[in-house]
Structures are given as structure tokens and as C-alpha cells.
Amino acid sequence: MRNYYKQKKTKIMKMKYFIPLILLFFTSCATIVRQVLPLENLPIPTGEYNVGTKIFTWKDSSRMEWFGEESNKYRRIPVQVWFPMEGGTKQLNSPYLQYPKDYIRVISTDFNIPGSLLLNIENIRTSATIDGNPKTRLGKRPIIIFSHGLGGFKNQNTIQMEELASHGYIIFACDHVYDAGFVRFSGDEIVYSKSFVRHFPKGTSEEEYWDTREKHLLIRSQDISFIIDQIEKLDTIDPALSLLCDSQNISLMGHSFGGSTVLSTLLREKSINSCIALDAWTLPMPSNEINQNINTSFLHLGQLSDKYWENKNNRLKLDTLVQNNKKQSIRIRVPQTKHFDYSDFSYFTWATKLFGITGKINRNEFRLSLNKILVDYFNYTALNKGEFSIERVKQLYGEIEVIRD
């Protein structure tokens, strides 16, 4: 295995032991934790529409599950959809997480953070109305499909999902099962991630590791293609929602491993309108994909520094892919941001900065700028509305590095 994986593991281990020592005093009292480490509700979306959300579990009868104990079952895909809704409200009245106790258990285990520090997660609220009625009189609206990162969740970028939906977009996001932090299907059936480096057998060679990651990438990409197929037959699944969905106007968006997932999908799904990658992990993409033409309008937003990846090939692969793209590619590198600034994780509490999980950038200002960039870009590429100029981007972000190809 490459040295940068050993280095990353060492850094994570240091953080695992450092955090509990600093906060040991607070773990004994939930009341103190809630006061010292409050977690904020999601911000109210700025668009004109109230937002509804629905959750489905779809079965792909064309594919068997890819992990051993499930290899005799068809792959199941949990999907959440955000959309403009009829009526409703922008009040914070819905829970952010379906299963907060499971979420606390996963985060506590993965980062060795005392669960008592995460108690406030179950109190986080969002303005999206669960099982709201789609605003069908809007007619067909553009679709965005989102792919989460390694160990992430379908709702890890809910702030962006709600913002886009409030501006008239329909957003589908799935849990990549066995890659998502956890998936609860029903009752006591919980499927945890088996995709981290620690899940690989001891003695796994570098070649074996990347062969597995390429297979992993393909399965994730097939998940996205399956969602596209399901959208085509949505009138038999949810007739009201189908009236809003323009299946001929689909864009993709992904964070981290989700970034390479949507980029890989572009090579199989030729009708995609545009694509946004948030701090993409491109290392799993094989050379034969990197050297192809994605032929799609593409925007990448990410960190200015390469320290997180500890491997210059992540940037080099992105550069190569961009150079081979025959359509417009724009890369935005934002100073003082880190990997998890491009998800909801950075918004909930200042403590993420204290432990170096997120960057020094002002989280509220960055959220507003990021949301504005996403809305402006999709308006430009999916609706032919407005403009997406480098000058406007610089006004929003200030000191950034912008590369346009």
C-alpha cells in the first residue's frame, strides 16, 4: 500500500486520541456538551419555493450485491429526493437525520469521538417537509443526481440539496450500499461500510488495492445509471413527482469519491447536461477513463492545497481529464478550505475547525458563496439562464485560483 495511506492513517489516529483528551471534561455531562458544543440547524434555503423530500428504496434486479454475504441478493439502493413542493413552509420542523442514534454510533466508531459529544445531532432540524406534495404546476424541471463520498451518506450535502430545490431543481441522491457510513433498510437490518482501508485484508498489494477500487468505482457508477433508468419510469413509481422531472435534462454532482463516480458515469451516460465535482478524489479512476473525453460541461471546486490527498497524482489525474474534455471545464481552488468544508459537516459547529477537520474559511460566508455558485452554474448549463463568468466567481470568493479550459 502506498505510503500516503500510512501517513493518513497516522494522522487520523493522532486525531482520534487528541480529541477525547481535549474534551474529556465535557463527556461526562450531556447538558454541558449541549451548551459548549451546540450543533446548528440547517440554514433556510434562499429560493422562492418551499422544499419537500421523499425517500425510496429501489431494487436493481439486473445486478447482484457485490459483497460476499449479500452476493445472492439483488442490489438495493436507498434514494432521497428533494423538490419544490405545493404549500409547505420554510420553518425548521423536520429532523435532519432519520436514524440519529445509528449516525452517532458510526461517527463515534470511525473517529473515536465519544458519542456524548454528538448528542445534539438528533436535534438538528431542516425546513424540507417529509413526503410533501410536488409542485406539479411548475411543469418539467431539471434533475441533478448526487453521489456521496467514501463513508458518506445520501444526505451529507442537504444544505446544497435544499438550496437547489428551492430554486426549482429536482435532486436525487443515493446511498452507495457498503460504501455509505451505514444504511438502515428496515427494522434491525443495518448495513455498515466495508470500503475503508481498514476493511482490506492484511497484505493487500498496491495493485490489488487499486483493482478493487476500480471495481468499487464501477459499482457506484452503475448505481447512478440505475437511478437514471428509474427516473425514466418514475410515472409508475410516483406519478406526481414524475410530472416535475425532466428526464431529458439531467446533471450530476458528487463529493470526494462521489466526484470520480459522476465523472466516470459521464463516459457511460452520454446525455448528461453538466457535472459538478466537489473536491473530487480522482485516484480511483483508471487511466483508460482519465484519457477519454467526457464531452460535458464541467465545474470542479476544491481545496487550494494538495496536502489532504498527500499524492500529487490526484491533481494530475484531474488536470488530464480536464485537458481531454472537449466541452468547457472550470476549476476553482478555494484557499482556507478543507475536504469536509464541501459538505454539511463544516456547518454544524465551530469545533470542526478546532480539530483541523475543516478549514479556516468563514463557514457561513463559504456556504452562501458555494450555494450561489452551484445555482448559477446549473442555471447557466441546465436552463440557459444568466451567465457563469470568471469575474462573477472571483467577486463571490475573493482570493481564489481559477483555471478555465
Residue positions per predicted region:
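Domain-level recognition of soluble alpha/beta enzyme cores
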Residues: 33-143, 363, 374
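Alpha/beta-hydrolase-fold serine-hydrolase catalytic core, especially in secreted/extracellular enzymes
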Residues: 34-45, 52, 61, 68-69, ...
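Active-site machinery of serine-nucleophile hydrolases
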Residues: 85-88, 95-112, 155-204, 335
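Short substrate-entry loop that stabilizes the transition state in hydrolases
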Residues: 127-141, 146-184, 306-311
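Alpha/beta-hydrolase active-site loop
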Residues: 184-244
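Primarily recognizes the serine-hydrolase "nucleophile elbow" in alpha/beta-hydrolase
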Residues: 227-292
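The feature captures the conserved acid-bearing segment of alpha/beta-hydrolase catalytic domains
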Residues: 273-339
